[in-house]
């Protein structure tokens, strides 16, 4: 089991660090009182391998509880529980700028100067910083660069390379655009199998409907251009730290055209080695509701 304790200065990026660890498959807990670390560790180690990666954020917000951290770490060591400490640091100038931009008060100086709070916090965290296995100074790091630094230390390289999970989702506009869509494409300009008597009762998953939709030059031009666009977008989304991408393709009812196109895009992405899922949200919606136009 990999057990990471994330700590550091307020404003240095602990929140972003824990999000990055969560993206890497860590079970994450924010602001756990240090006195609870031993019991939490025991519970996790008793899961018989179900939980393999854990990250805890421990910081000065714990107040007097933070002083119990070293006793808890001593207990972990004595009991044979392996752990790592990640310490997030930044310069005074950068921390002051971040606090002013966010209009937040420093936890150790809520009614005073930010610099005084930073100084007090540095003093209290000096020992834990000295014990840290990894220290990341975020003064010059953008969010993406911090994420990359976290990935470099804690990620599994094959996991990092394939971490963008893509979902291709077909839907019907009359049932509403999926709220979690990242990209939405309207294919209602394509010829509609609904008006072909022998195809109406089938869906875009059926070969006869798919063959009909894909038989038109306009369809193939659209699919080719969409695939080229995705070839450009996907690596750039990943570069900026995106880890999930939902591509929604809609027609009127979500049963014929959108399903056929979604399947074509899914197969194309899959053939290129992407981690991709397919979902046809409304494929049976009009059957259940007795709707007409698809």
UniProtKB/Swiss-Prot annotation:
Q: Which residues take part in binding GTP? A: 59-62
Give this protein's Gene Ontology molecular function annotations. ATP binding; GTP binding
Provenance organism = Clostridium botulinum (strain Hall / ATCC 3502 / NCTC 13319 / Type A)
Which PANTHER family does the entry mention? RNASE ADAPTER PROTEIN RAPZ (PTHR30448:SF0)
Role, per record: Displays ATPase and GTPase activities.
Keyword list (alphabetical) reads: ATP-binding, GTP-binding, Nucleotide-binding
Membership in a protein family = Belongs to the RapZ-like family.
Specify which residues bind ATP according to the UniProt entry for this protein: 8-15
Q: Give yes or no: UniProt keyword rRNA-binding.
A: no
Top-rank lineage group of the source organism: Bacteria
Q: What is this protein called?
A: Nucleotide-binding protein CBO3377/CLC_3320
């Amino acid at each position: 089991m990999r057990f990471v304790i994330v700590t550091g200065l307020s404003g240095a990026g602990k929140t972003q660090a824990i999000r990055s660890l969560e993206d890497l498959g860590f079970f994450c807990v924010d602001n756990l009182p240090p006195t609870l670390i031993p019991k939490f560790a025991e519970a996790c180690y008793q899961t018989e391998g179900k939980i393999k990666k854990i990250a805890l954020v421990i910081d000065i917000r714990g107040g007097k509880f933070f002083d119990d951290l070293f006793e808890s770490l001593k207990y972990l060591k004595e009991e044979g529980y392996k752990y790592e400490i990640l310490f997030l640091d930044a310069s005074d100038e950068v921390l002051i700028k971040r606090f002013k931009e966010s209009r937040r008060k420093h936890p150790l100086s809520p009614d005073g100067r930010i610099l005084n709070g930073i100084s007090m916090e540095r003093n209290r965290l000096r020992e834990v910083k000295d014990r840290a296995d990894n220290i990341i100074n975020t003064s010059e790091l953008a969010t993406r660069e911090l994420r990359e630094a976290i990935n470099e230390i804690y990620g599994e390289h094959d996991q990092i390379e394939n971490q963008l999970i893509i979902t291709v989702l077909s839907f019907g506009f009359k049932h509403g655009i999926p709220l979690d869509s990242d990209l939405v494409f309207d294919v209602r300009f394509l010829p509609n199998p609904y008006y072909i008597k022998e195809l109406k009762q089938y869906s875009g998953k059926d070969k006869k409907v798919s063959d009909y939709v894909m038989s038109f030059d306009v369809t193939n031009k659209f699919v080719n251009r969409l695939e080229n666009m995705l070839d450009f977008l996907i690596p750039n989304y990943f570069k900026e730290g995106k880890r999930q991408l939902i591509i929604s393709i809609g027609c009127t009812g979500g049963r014929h055209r959108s399903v056929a196109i979604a399947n074509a895009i899914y197969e194309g992405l899959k053939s290129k080695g992407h981690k991709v899922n397919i979902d046809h949200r409304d494929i049976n919606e009009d059957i259940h509701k007795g709707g007409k136009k698809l």
